[in-house]
């Protein structure tokens, strides 16, 4: 039965004269892994930033897990992001000199958990991502694939409703990329986390349940709406 966790309706967004989004309707089902594909500059990041409440569309609405993000102030949206959304980027989100455990524990400490509880959770997530024996190493001394697993653990440790992953394996070779995507998909399937995955790469998109294609600020193709 359909159980949407994100419902976006009529999204438009311009930056000066550039119309980045020109009227997008999109529904993401709870527990679904959705790939967002499209050429460079087509509007993928702008769409995902609107879906995650990072920016507000010029018109249209985004309801995420029952909350209308477009009715909230920037501060309220920031709170929703902290509590219900995880992010993984291509690189740059980890503190390279802290240990993997400290990196993953950080969002829990920011949410007010004790150091002891945060570390226990962090180590458990590192373990789930195959890094149980790397918990005391710093991402700066790890391979790119290992560091991305730490980033994924950090994004999931707060048990977000939705994980937004923007080219999460874009800086990895194909073997590491497949291994990291496989590990990520295993833990999100286990935890029932919804994933919105931006990618240029068809092999990466193949890990998703469904793909949508953004072209010139519009969704194109037959995959834009959930099959009946
Ligand atoms: N903050 C901004 N200021 C001005 N123009 C912007 C801004 N953000 C995006 N744009 C423009 O909006 C359009 C869509 O950009 P967007 O980053 O969403 O595309 P994309 O599909 O994610 O591209 P890429 O795959 O290269 O990351 C582009 O023409 C881009 O130059």
Task: Name these PLM-found stretches.
Residues 211-223:
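H-loop (His-switch) and adjacent beta-strand-loop-beta switch element
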Residues 1-12, 220-228:
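ABC-family P-loop ATPase nucleotide-binding domain
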């Amino acid at each position: 039965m359909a159980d949407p966790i994100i419902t976006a309706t009529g999204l438009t967004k311009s930056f000066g004269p550039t119309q980045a989004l020109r009227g997008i309707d999109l529904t993401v089902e709870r527990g679904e892994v959705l790939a967002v594909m499209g050429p460079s500059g087509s509007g993928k990041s702008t769409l995902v930033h609107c879906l995650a409440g990072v920016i507000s569309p010029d018109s249209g609405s985004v309801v995420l897990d029952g909350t209308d993000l477009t009715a909230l102030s920037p501060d309220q949206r920031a709170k929703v992001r902290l509590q219900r959304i995880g992010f993984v980027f291509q690189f740059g989100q980890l503190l390279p000199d802290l240990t993997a455990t400290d990196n993953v524990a950080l969002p829990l400490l920011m949410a007010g958990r004790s150091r002891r509880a945060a570390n226990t959770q962090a180590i458990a997530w590192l373990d789930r991502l195959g890094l149980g024996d790397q918990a005391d190493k710093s991402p700066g001394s790890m391979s790119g694939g290992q560091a991305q697993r730490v980033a994924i653990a950090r994004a999931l440790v707060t048990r977000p409703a939705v994980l937004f992953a923007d080219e999460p394996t874009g800086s990895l070779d194909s073997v590491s990329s497949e291994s990291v995507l496989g590990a990520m998909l295993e833990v999100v399937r286990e935890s029932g986390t919804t994933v919105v995955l931006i990618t240029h790469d068809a092999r990466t998109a193949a890990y998703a349940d469904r793909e949508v294609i953004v072209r010139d600020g519009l969704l194109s193709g037959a995959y834009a709406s959930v099959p009946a």
